[in-house]
Structures are given as structure tokens and as C-alpha cells.
A protein has these predicted regions:
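N-terminal amphipathic, basic-rich helices that act as targeting or association modules
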Residues: 2-168, 434, 508-524, 528, ...
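Thiamine diphosphate
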Residues: 3-5, 184-204, 210, 224-235, ...
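Glycine- and acidic
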Residues: 12-13, 30-33, 80-88, 107-119, ...
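Non-catalytic terminal/interface segments that mediate subunit docking, oligomerization
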Residues: 81-99, 103, 110, 124, ...
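Cofactor-binding active-site loop characterized by glycine-rich and histidine/acidic residues
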Residues: 82-95, 99-114, 120-262, 285-286, ...
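Short alpha-helical segments and helix-capping/turn motifs at coil-helix boundaries
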Residues: 113-117, 129-138, 144-148, 199-203, ...
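Residue-level marker for buried hydrophobic side chains located in beta-strands
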Residues: 240-241, 269, 534, 640, ...
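A structural-propensity feature for long, helix-poor, extended segments
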Residues: 240-241, 247, 625-646, 651
């Protein structure tokens, strides 16, 4: 085998030997001539034609989504910034100073219990130029003529945003002094949190990775609103700021294919490529910018790289033989970090010194001049040009890969250092160096006090600051807390078909009840169009396929094929104005769409009512971080956990059977959760949710678990509506037994409440015990009510004690209390403190891993069926001294309970 053959056989990683350099030169010269005379677009077309011809000729063409390690926009193609860059530079300097001062001041506190408040200086320092360009020239606030651009701001840069708002007069010095000190109501939150600063921050972007994911679905939802004629969103943009290290979060890149597929040209990602994450380099041995370029371009995005500032323009223009470009590509990110952590002499030797030709290029430059060769993200003009190109691009989402230095301007204390992310304490000399670097007019005598700096209102800088925001409609970030519009929710009687008993011999599930409720709501002329059904490829599972034809599935491209089931009544209909959001097998996407719709009252001044239904096990457990973010964003809407209950979804097994989603739901303070048993409970609860979230615009969202088990529905008992909402009502009176017969109270929720009905019959027939059965649609709401009463009593010891709703209901009864649910024991255990004093309380639940089998077998395995309820009731009576313990043993034997079987918790 020849050397050349061996090299070619090694694959695409090898470069074949140039056997005819003159021919190669002629081809390259021809391409250069086309570029010079006819432009880059024509050259691109010709190259594509040649590649296609090669493929058609069966030549294996290796694909690369990468371009050279240079700026995408040529200097000659840069749009000139119309602003006053000198004034903008001074304003940025003041913001840098105030952001630094805020963090350093916060960490000078030394409370007796110790501890630092934290904060970050380095991140904002690296992208101040980008925020300057956006705030001064691109980002519109909501106004009469514009719905407002949406900004997902990188969490760690919050001090810089506060520093800007301080100059604008939106935040006071007292608030800056209380950075990360929020308890007394004067402080500023650590990161963007709408819950904590409801009129300021719109979107929480920490945990990292959630911002990019949510933003993609937010941009898609803007298109959805426009396509359905609900709001004009065509001139609005979604800008997303992320860190290059953040892109390793799987959520960051997980939905970029959707953005390209749906042509979300209203979406712009700005990835701050300072090459560092918290501990060290993002890709020390590689090039994160090239990696991300390949990811995004390969997914169909428009990619703009901004790597080098204007100081490099002349050097690149003189780089006729490509030596400089070659070194730029060869240096890895670890090298680039080292260059900025050292000095100009180091850069001369270790960067330019790699090739005699590049070393000669800079022989006329001093070490300081070499050091001041900036990266693209620190060049205001080039940032403006890149932003303008991104803002005007049509047909694709755009990503800006902007190279910066983490800790820019922090000097030896942090610039380019691995420790910069944690740097929050600066000494006086470091502060002086920072001041001098950015020409802040603060004398040495005040350095120790580290004052904030704000020019007088009549200075050119302050006038310019306000003029630019006035031209763009107002100040950002800003959050709307209520929509201007209002709706009246249809009366509860509208949902009569769900409230009434099922006809004799007819059985339905609570999932079917939900679908009936939703279908009726969709018919409401006012509110119906605002309903947003969200699916993750489970419509047929939940019996919702009838909605496909009725309201259509949203697809911006319509339906360009004939569906295989077109001849059927419920065919799969995609439509440009479709109402259903079908996310495929994608719970994170479904939740992100739900969040976009659930916060539309704030982001779009349009009240929307999202209903997202999914396998309950794949809800809070799978996307818990997004659910927490939804709480932070004050989301309003319905989450429906279908096929719920550890023993009710009988055949699916361990990963599908949910026994703890309500425990997780209760960790979110503004999540109101219910586990209804009956259709009428579903209707009453959902109607209450509509009243609270739509009519009264309360900042809550609802979680309901739904069942796939069919049974007869008893219908609403008039007068129990409020009790259902509170979480507990007597649904079946105890049978009339002789006076003095033992009494017990059976509590339950979901389908296991029906086991209590059967247990009631067994207790009467086999043991002469009178059992009352209570439906408890929400042990979580009962718990919150009880805890609220407890708290009030703790803080008002001299006033009459408040009584919890649980105690109020059970105080009128006698006998032990047995609660059984299809969830872990912890769910019903929560109300134990509120059970009347002296009463025995037993809890049955489904602790342990799920498994596949029939429902009856699973309920026996988890010890929650009617027989275990009877045994628990008798045990409670025995502990109360009402029946002998032998009765319990007798029941165990009668019902064939295996006392030696393994505890289901460990099975």
C-alpha cells in the first residue's frame, strides 16, 4: 500500500496530498474572482452546486458544519452603529463599577452567625457590551405599537442589570445596598426571580439550561398566538443570553431542532463564550465555539460568530497566506484562557510566536498594544453589527457565538482566572485598578467606602440613557402582573353532563370526565378560543383524539400530506391555525409550552388557559425544575396527571406507576393539587380553578390526577361544592346500626376511596361496625389549611384558637380514623396533627416500587385494599378498647392476609 493510499484510507480526518498544486491554485483563484466580482452569495451557490454534483457522482463528501475561526461578518459588511459609542462606553463603565460595588459591599457584611451573601462580578464584566447594544438599540418595551421583546437574561449577570436600573432611576441606592437581602422587603433577588421581584423580572433563568429551553417554546408560542389571530406578535423577538458552559445542560440544546423546524426567526440566542465555567475551562482541549457552531448549523440555525475585535482587522487583512487564521484555529480554549490570564509579552511569545510570519506581523506593536487586542464581544461596534444582522434575519432562528473574557476589566484579581466566578471580595488596590481601568471619577479618599456612582440627571450620559429607552418604548426588564382583559367563566351548571350521575349501567373514568369538561369549555364563545390543550403524544391514551378534527393540531406549515386516517371522523388534522399543541414524546417541551401559555397574561397581555395532560409519573418527577420555575413565574393553568395511582395504572410497571406526584406537587407553594374520585369533583375543582385563575387573576396553578379506571359516578350532592374545594366532605353516611355499635371514619381519595365503600360494607356485614366514608380530594389542601391555623395560633396565643377544617369536620364524629390512598403514606400522614386530639389515626399507602399486575393483586400487594382497610379499622377500635385484639386477628385470618409477606416498601 502506498503512503498516499494509506492516508486516504484513514478516513476524513486525514488530508490527501496535493498532487497538483497549480490546479488547486487555479480553482481557488477562480473562487476568489467570483467572490470579488459577484459576491459571497453567488460563490456559495456555486459551491453548493459542485458539492451536489459530486454527491450525484457517488463521491463520498464529508460534511462539516464549521467555518473558520474568524468573524462571520466581514468588516466591509458591518452595519455602522448609529449611537454615540463614546457615551455608551462611559455608561457601561458606570454600570460595571456599580455592579462590582454591589457585590463587594454585600460580602463585607459579617453577621454574628457568619456566612457570605455571594454574588458574581465576572459574568456581567464579560458581556456588558452586549447588554449595552441591546438596551440602547434593539430591545423594545411593551407599548402601544409593540408587544415588547422578551429577554431571558443569564442569571449570573443580575448585578449588571440592577446597576443599569439604578442609573435609570428604577432602583434606589438602598435597594442596591440590600442586594441578596430580601427578607425585609427592600432587597434585590440573587438572580432573575419574578416571584421575588414581580414587576421587574419576567423569566427565571436559573437553574441553568431552563432559560434556553423555555425561550424556544416561548418564541413558538408567540407564533401560535399570531397564527390563531389572538395577538399580533410578528415584530416581537425573544432574546436569550446563555453561557457557553451552560450549553452542557441537556435542556439547553434539547429543543434547538424544533426552533429550526418551525422557522422561529423571532428567536435569537446569544451565547457568551468566555470559555470558562465555574471550575475551569469549558473545553480546555477543544474549541467550544466551533462545537456549538456545528450543533446549531447542523440543526438548521443561522450562525453568526463574533470572535475578534477591530484591533484584529488589520492583522487579518495582512494575513495573505492564512498563517494567522491557522494559529487562531490551532490554539485550543485552554490556550486562549491562558493568554488573557497573563500579559502582552506572553501573548507575543505563545500566540504570535508559533509562526515566524505571525511574529513578524506584530513586530511594530508594543506588548501593551498586543494585550489590548480585544475579543469580539468587547467591541461595541462589532457587537452592534452582529445584533443587527441577527435581528433582521428571516426564516431561521439565529445564534450569536460571541467570544469574550470572563472577568473583563478585573485585572490580576480575576480576568481569565479559574477563580473568577467565585471572586466577590476585592481589596482597595484591586478596586483602584478597576476604577482606573474604566475611568470612574471617584477619588482615593472614597475607595474604602466603595460608593456607587451616578452622574447628574442633566449630564449627556444620563440624557442619552433615557432617550434611548424612550425611543424603544420604555424600560426593561419589566413585568406585567395582570392582563388588561377580563373574562367571565361559564356557570358551573354549564358542565351538567359532568356533574350529573352516570346513567344506570354506564361507567366512565375521571379522565373521560375531564375530556367532557374540556370539550364543553371549548364551546364557550369567549373563553373557548383561549384554551390551549397540550399533549405529549398521549391523546389516544386519554381519549382526546376527538379534538384532532374539532380544533386541529397547530403546525405552522399546515398539513402537506394526506393523513392515513383521513376517511375517519377523528382523523389526525394538522392546521396552521390549530389549537392543540402536540409536542410528541417530550415532557420537557410540553411543560415549556404550558409555561409559555400559563404566563401569557404577563408576557402577551392575553389570558390563555392551558391544559397539559400527561402520564402523572412523568410530571413533577421528570420536569420538577420546570414546575418550580413555573411557580416562580406565577403561572396560571391546569396540569393533569393522567393514569395516576400506583395500583390503578395496572399493567405498566415500576417506572409508570405514580404514588408520589402529590407529595412533589405540595412542595410548590402556589400549586393547588387534587386527587378526585368522581366526575363531579373534577368539574367542581376545575371550575374553581377557572374562577381563580381567569376571573380573579390569582397567581396559582392547579394539578389534578386523573384515573383510567371506569366506574359509576354518583353525581354532585348540592351544597358540597365548597367542601370539595377545601379537600374533604362526607360522601357516604354510616349505615343505621343498633345504638352503641362501634363507629369508624374512613377517608380516601382517587380510586382507593371506592375500596373504602367496599370496606364500609364488610365492616357492617362481618363485624357490626358503622363506618362513615369521607372523600378527601386534597390531603395537600387540608394540610395547608391546618398549618395555617397552627401558625395563627402560635402567633396569637392570647386569642381564641382557630380550628383546622379537618378537626372541624371530624370533631362531630366518633371512632378511629383510617385514611387510604393510592399514594405513599406520607400523603395522608400530613393531616395527622389536625386530627382531633385523642383520636386514633391509621394511614394506608403505596410505599415502594410499582410493578405490573392486575389492580386487585397490586392493591393486595401494597396493603391498601378493602380487607386491609377493615383490618386497620378494627385495629384502631382495639387500640381504643372498643373491641378485643382477637377481632383483628380473626379478620386477618378471615380475609386470608399473609402476615409473613415482605413489606411492600422493600419488595
Amino acid at each position: 500500500m502506498s503512503d498516499q493510499t494509506a492516508q486516504q484510507g484513514a478516513g476524513v480526518a486525514s488530508t490527501p496530498t496535493d498532487i497538483d498544486q497549480q490546479e488547486t491554485r487555479e480553482w481557488l483563484d477562480a473562487l476568489s474572482a467570483v467572490i470579488d466580482k459577484e459576491g459571497a452569495e453567488r460563490a456559495h451557490f456555486l459551491i453548493e452546486q459542485m458539492l451536489e454534483h459530486a454527491r450525484q457522482s457517488s463521491i463520498d463528501m464529508p460534511f462539516s458544519a464549521n467555518t473558520g475561526y474568524v468573524n462571520t461578518i466581514e468588516t466591509s459588511q458591518e452595519a455602522r452603529c448609529p449611537g454615540n459609542l463614546e457615551i455608551e462606553g462611559r455608561l457601561r463603565a458606570y454600570m460595571r463599577w456599580n455592579a462590582m460595588a454591589m457585590v463587594v459591599k454585600a460580602n463585607r457584611h459579617h453577621p454574628p452567625e457568619g456566612g457570605d451573601l455571594g454574588g458574581h462580578i465576572g459574568s456581567f464584566a464579560s458581556l456588558a457590551n452586549m447588554f449595552g447594544a441591546g438596551f440602547n438599540h434593539f430591545w423594545h418595551a411593551e407599548s402601544e405599537n409593540h408587544g415588547g421583546d422578551l429577554l431571558y437574561i443569564q442569571g449570573h449577570v443580575s448585578p449588571g442589570i440592577y446597576a443599569r436600573a439604578y442609573l435609570e432611576g428604577r432602583l434606589s441606592e438602598e435597594q442596591l445596598l440590600n442586594f441578596r437581602q430580601e427578607v425585609d422587603g427592600k432587597g434585590l433577588s440573587s438572580y432573575p426571580h419574578p416571584k421575588l421581584m414581580p414587576e421587574f423580572w419576567q423569566f427565571p433563568t436559573v437553574s441553568m439550561g431552563l432559560g434556553p429551553l423555555m425561550a424556544i417554546y416561548q418564541a413558538r408560542f408567540l407564533k401560535y398566538l399570531h397564527a390563531r389571530g389572538i395577538a399580533n406578535t410578528e415584530n416581537r423577538k425573544v432574546w436569550v443570553f446563555c453561557g457557553d458552559g451552560e450549553m452542557d445542560e441537556v435542556e439547553s440544546l434539547g429543543a434547538i431542532g424544533l426552533a429550526a423546524r418551525e422557522n422561529l426567526d423571532n428567536l435569537i440566542f446569544v451565547i457568551n463564550c468566555n470559555l470558562q465555567r465555574l471550575d475551569g475551562p469549558v473545553r480546555g482541549n477543544g474549541k467550544i465555539i466551533q462545537e456549538l457552531e456545528g450543533e446549531f448549523r447542523g440543526s438548521g440555525w443561522n450562525v453568526i460568530k463574533l470572535l475578534w475585535g477591530k484591533g484584529w482587522d488589520d492583522l487579518l487583512a495582512r494575513d495573505k497566506d492564512g498563517a494567522l487564521r491557522k494559529i487562531m484555529m490551532e490554539c485550543n480554549d485552554g490556550d486562549y484562557q491562558s493568554f488573557k490570564a497573563n500579559d502582552g509579552a506572553y501573548v507575543r511569545k505563545n500566540f504570535f510566536g508559533r509562526d515566524p510570519r505571525t511574529l513578524k506581523m506584530v513586530e511594530h506593536m508594543s506588548d501593551d498594544e498586543i494585550w489590548n487586542l480585544r475579543r469580539g464581544g468587547h467591541d461595541a461596534q462589532k457587537v452592534y453589527a452582529a445584533f443587527k444582522a441577527a435581528n433582521e434575519h428571516k426564516g431561521q432562528p439565529t445564534v450569536l457565538l460571541v467570544k469574550t473574557v470572563k472577568g473583563f476589566g478585573m485585572g490580576k484579581i480575576g480576568e481569565g482566572k479559574n477563580t473568577v466566578h467565585q471572586t466577590k471580595k476585592l481589596g482597595d488596590e484591586d478596586i483602584k485598578a478597576f476604577r482606573d481601568r474604566f475611568n470612574i471619577p471617584i477619588p482615593d479618599s472614597q475607595i474604602a467606602d466603595l460608593p456607587f456612582y451616578k452622574p447628574a440627571d442633566d449630564t449627556p450620559e444620563m440624557k442619552y440613557l433615557h432617550e434611548r429607552r424612550k425611543a424603544l418604548g420604555g424600560y426593561l426588564p419589566h413585568r406585567r402582573t395582570k392582563a388588561d382583559e377580563s373574562f367571565t367563566v361559564p356557570a358551573l351548571e354549564t358542565f351538567k353532563a359532568v356533574l350529573d350521575p352516570t346513567p344506570e349501567g354506564r361507567e366512565i373514568s375521571t379522565t373521560q370526565a375531564y375530556v367532557r369538561f374540556l370539550t364543553q369549555l371549548l364551546r364557550d364563545q369567549a373563553l373557548g378560543p383561549r384554551v390551549v390543550p397540550i399533549l405529549v403524544d398521549e391523546a389516544r391514551t386519554f381519549g382526546m383524539e376527538g379534538l384532532f378534527r374539532q380544533i386541529g393540531i397547530y403546525n405552522p406549515h399546515g398539513q402537506q400530506y394526506t393523513p392515513v386516517d383521513k376517511d375517519q371522523v377523528m382523523y389526525y388534522k394538522e392546521d396552521k391555525a390549530g389549537q392543540i399543541l402536540q409536542e410528541g414524546i417530550n415532557e420537557a417541551g410540553g411543560m415549556s409550552s404550558w409555561i409559555a401559555a400559563a404566563t401569557s397574561y404577563s408576557t402577551n397581555n392575553r389570558i390563555m388557559v392551558p391544559f397539559y395532560v400527561y402520564y402523572s409519573m412523568f410530571g413533577f418527577q421528570r420536569i420538577g425544575d420546570l414546575a418550580w420555575a413555573a411557580g416562580d413565574m406565577q403561572a396560571r393553568g391546569f396540569l393533569l396527571g393522567g393514569t395516576s395511582g400506583r395500583t390503578t395504572l395496572n399493567g405498566e410497571g415500576l417506572q409508570h406507576e405514580d404514588g408520589h406526584s402529590h407529595i412533589l406537587a405540595n412542595t410548590i407553594p402556589n400549586c393547588v393539587s387534587y386527587d378526585p374520585t368522581f366526575a363531579h369533583e373534577v368539574a367542581v375543582i376545575m371550575h374553581d380553578g377557572l374562577k381563580r385563575m381567569v376571573e380573579r387573576q390569582e397567581n396559582v396553578f392547579y394539578y389534578l390526577t386523573l384515573l383510567n379506571e371506569n366506574y359509576a359516578m354518583p353525581g354532585l350532592q348540592p351544597g358540597t361544592e365548597e367542601q370539595i374545594i377545601k379537600g374533604m366532605y362526607l360522601c357516604k353516611q354510616a349505615p343505621a346500626l343498633p345504638q352503641g355499635a362501634p363507629a369508624v371514619q374512613l377517608l380516601g381519595s382517587g380510586t382507593i376511596l371506592r375500596e373504602s365503600f367496599f370496606a364500609q360494607e364488610l365492616l357492617e356485614k362481618d363485624w357490626g361496625v358503622a363506618a362513615s366514608v369521607w372523600s378527601c380530594p386534597s390531603f395537600n389542601e387540608l394540610t395547608r389549611d391546618g398549618q395555617e391555623a397552627d401558625r395563627w395560633n402560635l402567633l396569637h396565643p392570647t386569642e381564641a384558637a382557630r380550628v383546622s377544617y379537618v378537626e372541624e369536620q371530624l370533631a362531630r364524629t366518633t371512632g378511629p380514623i383510617v385514611a387510604s390512598t393510592d399514594y405513599m403514606k406520607a400523603y395522608a400522614e400530613q393531616i395527622r396533627p389536625f386530627v382531633p386530639k385523642g383520636r386514633t389515626y391509621k394511614v394506608l399507602g403505596t410505599d415502594g416500587f410499582g410493578r405490573s399486575d392486575f389492580r386487585s393483586k397490586l392493591r393486595e400487594h401494597f396493603e391498601i385494599n378493602r380487607h386491609y382497610i377493615v383490618v386497620a379499622a378494627l385495629k384502631g377500635l382495639a387500640e381504643d378498647g372498643v373491641v378485643p385484639a382477637s377481632k383483628v386477628a380473626e379478620a386477618i385470618q378471615k380475609y386470608g392476609i399473609n402476615t409473613d409477606k415482605i413489606n411492600p416498601l422493600y419488595a
